Amino acid sequence: MPMIEVKVTMDLPAEKRDLLKAEFGKAISIMGKPESYLMINLVDKQDLYFGGKKLDKGAYVEVKVLGSIDGGASDKMTAKLCEILEKELGIPGNAVYVSYWGTANWGWNGSNF
């Protein structure tokens, strides 16, 4: 039931997509969610602006989960996501926004949980 959507400014070749998928798959456990239900959407070549300036390297990340968001877990998740983006893509943490969304209604396979 978790979903991670990442929009980045640069091109993401297949090998980088695979690395990100693997790292996000491990990281989702911080939120108490299983990788077996994780959906990931990687969107590259986006125009992102911060403080009125276009970012050469930047990212916007949305983390969506079934249920409520634990503040402590989201703090740890933000740190981990920024670490992954810095390591794999060279995106500094001050060029990353992360938002969290929790919902009581999540559909899958023809019904809601």
Give the location of each predicted region:
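Interaction-mediating elements
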Residues: 1-113
